[in-house]
Each structure stands twice: as structure tokens, then as C-alpha cells.
């Protein structure tokens, strides 16, 4: 919400006018969802880094087969870029190519090795910080201020609290009750909200536990309701694997509808304003759906991990914060969570846990990118 999309459009416009259009630029992102979001925001076709480099599954980025022959490469969501991915990009661009990385170094680190964005900033690579927040609602004063100031804060007492950024105080034992009551009411009302959790399993407010409970509260099983495995007609689901046949990406959230009787049951996924349909019984019998295409891989999405939410936006987010999961509460995780919200953040738990998260900085990754680059600058072997 800081004007990044406008900046991308301006950069591309400048290059369009200065070089031949066929070799002007490539827009890319680390994931399919991020690439599609970039395309939708700018109206300019974007690709995954994997696709731009011609990387095949399970291969190393340095073994990519495609050269990028443009004068400009713009990579969005650069906090997700691993050291190997960056090496693949730099290994396959022309010597006179400009590489522009856009991202937030305060968000979660990449899944792969390295801390690329922060390391490049330490090396003094030319950079611009967009500090003004525009995405948050004008009425969400505290949320807007907290998102902008969070990287510089160290104590929950420095946060601004109002109706747009609030804490529902609760003991760990009743966090699931309070959170699910609030979330279920909002889901049933059709609000654009998302429950986020720092943990996937093992606690009462893990993604697994919250999904089971919220499914029962928001979409209870009845004698008339159709099911498919753990899914029920009307469930909120997330796509967990890119599927080119259905043009959906890992991270897409939609609603699953199940209709018909055996052997003619049909599943329809409503996602991003389109409908994706397949024959359930064909999948169960043959392992494939329409035209032998694999069906979408799905999971319940009433609750998601903060990692899964990266790159997405919601009007409101609800998140449990408890000392019971203190080992998983990090500064960049909490920051990533609150920056997913455009209007409202509701934390359910206690201030001690919020404070712990704000003061807990992940152990630094030893990628040696900074040290080796500095040695090369001095003319020494890295």
C-alpha cells in the first residue's frame, strides 16, 4: 500500500520509450500467485522467476536453460527471493541489464537459503524506501500508523490502539473460544477477513485446530449437505499447488461447491470471480479429472499460517498471540500478519505475547553474501 505498483508502472513506461519494445523488460515474481497479482495490478504480463529462467522442477536455478535478453528485469515480492534464485537471475541476464528488486525486508524471510533483500541493503545497493501507507483505510488511523512505524518499534506500549488495531485480552485456554466466536460471526456475514496463526499444528489455536472448529461453526455438516473427503459443500478452501489447466495458483482462496449424487458428483471451485469444475467420481476412480487433468490440490482456509498469507490482502485479520507459542512469535512474522490487513487487525491473547514477538528477531542467516561481496570489492578471492 505504499505506491509500489505505481512505481513499477512508471519504470516500465520509461523503458518502453527508451529501447525497442521486444527487448525492453521482464516482470517476474517468486511465486505463481505473486506473478499473477503483479499482472492484475499493473495490467502488464508478469511471469514466475522459474518460468522466466526456464527452470524445471527439482533442478537448481543455476541449471536454468533460458537467457533473459531484456534491458530491465523487475522482481516483485523480493523478500521471498532466495540466494539460489538471485544467483539464477544474475547468471542469466545480459551485462547491460538493470535488475530492480521490490519488496519489504521486514517481512518473513525466504523459504530457501539466504536473506537476499537485507543483505543487498547492507551492501549499499542503491535503494529507495516508500514509507507512506496508502492501502489502509483513512479511518484505520492506528493500523496505518502501526504498519508504517512497526520496523522501528520495540515494545507493544509504542503501538497505537484503536478500533482498527485492537487486542482482545484472553488467557491461552480461552483464546480459541474467543477467536472462533469473532471469526465465525464475520465469516457468516460475508466479510473479507482471514484468521492467521503462527503455528500449523499441536495447539488449540493452530491452523489445523482452528480450521476444524471454524468449519463446524461456519459450515456445519447436515444430512443434506454434500461432502468430498474432509470438504463440505460451501467450504472456504485454499489451493496448495499451482495448476495450469485450471489457471489457479498456490495460495488462491475460494469457495468449494459440491453437487450431484454418485457417480455424477461435481465439484466447483469459485475463485477470483471464475468457476473451475471437475468430476469428483472420475478423480476418485482414475486419479484425474477433465481431459485427464489433475484436480486442484485443496485445503481448508478458514485459518492460514502467516507464511501462506504472504502476498495477500484482506479487510481484516484475526490472529492468536500467546506465550504458549512464544517460540514461533517473531517480529517479522507479526509485522507480515498485520500488514495483510487494509482496515482492521484483531489480536486475541495477551500483551506479553505481543511484546515477545516485537522483541524477538530471528537468528541471522549466515549466507556470507555480504562478506564475499566485500572481498570481491577489495580484489580478493571470495
Language model feature labels by segment:
Residues 2, 22, 70, 96, ...:
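Active-site lining segments that contact anionic ligands and/or coordinate catalytic metals
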Residues 2-161:
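ASCE P-loop NTPase helicase motor core
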Residues 35-36, 109, 203-205, 353-357:
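Short, charged/polar "capping" segments at the starts of alpha-helices
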Residues 252-382:
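C-terminal accessory regions
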Residues 28, 72-76, 100, 194-196, ...:
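Structural motif
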Residues 68, 94, 230-233, 249, ...:
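Residue-level recognition of short, solvent-exposed, well-ordered loop/turn junctions
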Residues 105-249, 254-263:
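Conserved helicase motor core of P-loop NTPases
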Residues 43-44, 89-92, 210-215, 333-337, ...:
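Short, solvent-exposed amphipathic alpha-helical segments in soluble enzyme
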Amino acid at each position: 500500500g505504499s505506491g509500489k505498483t505505481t512505481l513499477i508502472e512508471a519504470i516500465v513506461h520509461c523503458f518502453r520509450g527508451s529501447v525497442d519494445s521486444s527487448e525492453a523488460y521482464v516482470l517476474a515474481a517468486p511465486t505463481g500467485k505473486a506473478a499473477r497479482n503483479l499482472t492484475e495490478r499493473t495490467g502488464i504480463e508478469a511471469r514466475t522467476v522459474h518460468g522466466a529462467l526456464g527452470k524445471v522442477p527439482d533442478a537448481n536455478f543455476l541449471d536454468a536453460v533460458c537467457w533473459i535478453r531484456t534491458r530491465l528485469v523487475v522482481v516483485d515480492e523480493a523478500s521471498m527471493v532466495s540466494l539460489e534464485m538471485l544467483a539464477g537471475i544474475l547468471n542469466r541476464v545480459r551485462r547491460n541489464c538493470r535488475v530492480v528488486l521490490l519488496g519489504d525486508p521486514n517481512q518473513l524471510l525466504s523459504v530457501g537459503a539466504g536473506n537476499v533483500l537485507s543483505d543487498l541493503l547492507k551492501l549499499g545497493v542503491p535503494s529507495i524506501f516508500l514509507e507512506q501507507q496508502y492501502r489502509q483505510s483513512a479511518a484505520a488511523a492506528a493500523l496505518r500508523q502501526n504498519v508504517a512505524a512497526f520496523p522501528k518499534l520495540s515494545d507493544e506500549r509504542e503501538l497505537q490502539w484503536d478500533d482498527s488495531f485492537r487486542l482482545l485480552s484472553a488467557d491461552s485456554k480461552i483464546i480459541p473460544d474467543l477467536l472462533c466466536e469473532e471469526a465465525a460471526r464475520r465469516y457468516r456475514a460475508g466479510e473479507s477477513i482471514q484468521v492467521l496463526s503462527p503455528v500449523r499444528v499441536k495447539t488449540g489455536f493452530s491452523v489445523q485446530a482452528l480450521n476444524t472448529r471454524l468449519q463446524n461453526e461456519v459450515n456445519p455438516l447436515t444430512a443434506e449437505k454434500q461432502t468430498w473427503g474432509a470438504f463440505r459443500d460451501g467450504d472456504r478452501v485454499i489451493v496448495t499447488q499451482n495448476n495450469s489447466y485450471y489457471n489457479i495458483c498456490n495460495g488462491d482462496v475460494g469457495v468449494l461447491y459440491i453437487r450431484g449424487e454418485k457417480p455424477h458428483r461435481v465439484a466447483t471451485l469459485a475463485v477470483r470471480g471464475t468457476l473451475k469444475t471437475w468430476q469428483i467420481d472420475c478423480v476418485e476412480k482414475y486419479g484425474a479429472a477433465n481431459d485427464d487433468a489433475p484436480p486442484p490440490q485443496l485445503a481448508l482456509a478458514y485459518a492460514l499460517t502467516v507464511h501462506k498469507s504472504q502476498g495477500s490482502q484482506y479487510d481484516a485479520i484475526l490472529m492468536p498471540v500467546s506465550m504458549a507459542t512464544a517460540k514461533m512469535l517473531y517480529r517479522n512474522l507479526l509485522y507480515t500478519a498485520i500488514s495483510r490487513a487494509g482496515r482492521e487487525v484483531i489480536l486475541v491473547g495477551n500483551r506479553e505475547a505481543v511484546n515477545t514477538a516485537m522483541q524477538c528477531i530471528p537468528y541471522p542467516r549466515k549466507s556470507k553474501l555480504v562478506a564475499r561481496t566485500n572481498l570481491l570489492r577489495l580484489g580478493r578471492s571470495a
